[in-house]
């Protein structure tokens, strides 16, 4: 299935409001999924230090599943905070999809426990009807308030690591199944290039 142009333009438009150069792009697909269903996602992370022990993390994430027969909804994502502060936290303060709620510390089986995230019903495993998630070709923007003693030293990569620190959940696939993905090692780049590239490379 051809990824909708609306989705690509939406993410590019959202990216226009990001002023920081510290932007990281990540993605996940069949190579990093548990069930290898073919679902996929692309995301951009932007961290900004705001003063004291505080910062703001903005995550733009899209369901880029390419095959219409797969279907499904992106229903949650979680991440770790690679901080020297063991009490570091990130709390969801806004999102374009209001069905996504703050998870806090979440057991995202089978990957383990993560520091923060957002999911339908604040639940990685369930969370109610998956139709409230991000369908194929749709994206959402979520903003987290970050608190850490070393907030001034954090960057966008502090929430991804080599990829194993960011996980995404899909439910409601057309065959009734679900899947869970980790992000592979991320890359960085200019906002405009990321916005164009992450969608065009999956068009069929």
What are these regions (language model features)?
Residues 184-201:
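A short, hydrophobic C-terminal helix/tail in secreted or cell-surface proteins
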Residues 17-21:
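Sec/Tat signal peptide C-region and signal peptidase I cleavage site
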Residues 2-8, 187-191:
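Sec-dependent signal peptide recognition
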Residues 16, 146-148, 203:
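Prokaryotic Sec-type signal peptides and long signal-anchor helices
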Residues 1-4, 200-204:
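Positively charged n-region of N-terminal signal peptides that target proteins for export
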Residues 7-15:
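Bacterial N-terminal signal peptides
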Residues 22-182:
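Mature extracellular "passenger" or substrate-interacting domains of secreted, surface-exposed proteins
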């Amino acid at each position: 299935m051809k990824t909708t142009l609306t989705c690509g333009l939406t993410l590019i438009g959202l990216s226009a409001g990001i002023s920081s150069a510290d932007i990281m792009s990540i993605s996940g697909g069949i190579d990093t999924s548990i069930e290898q269903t073919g679902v996929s996602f692309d995301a951009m992370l932007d961290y900004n230090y705001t003063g004291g022990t505080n910062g703001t993390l903005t995550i733009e994430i899209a369901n880029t599943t390419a095959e219409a027969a797969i279907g499904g909804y992106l229903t949650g994502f979680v991440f770790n905070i690679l901080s020297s502060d063991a009490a570091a936290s990130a709390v969801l303060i806004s999102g374009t999809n209001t069905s996504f709620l703050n998870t806090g510390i979440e057991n995202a089986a089978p990957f383990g426990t993560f520091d923060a995230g957002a999911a339908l019903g604040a639940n990685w495993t369930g969370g109610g009807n998956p139709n409230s998630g991000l369908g194929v070709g749709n994206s959402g923007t979520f903003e987290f308030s970050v608190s850490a003693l070393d907030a001034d030293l954090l960057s966008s990569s502090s929430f991804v690591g080599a990829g194993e620190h960011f996980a995404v959940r899909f439910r409601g696939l057309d065959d009734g199944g679900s899947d869970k993905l980790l992000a592979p090692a991320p890359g960085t780049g200019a906002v405009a290039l990321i916005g164009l590239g992450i969608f065009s490379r999956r068009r069929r």
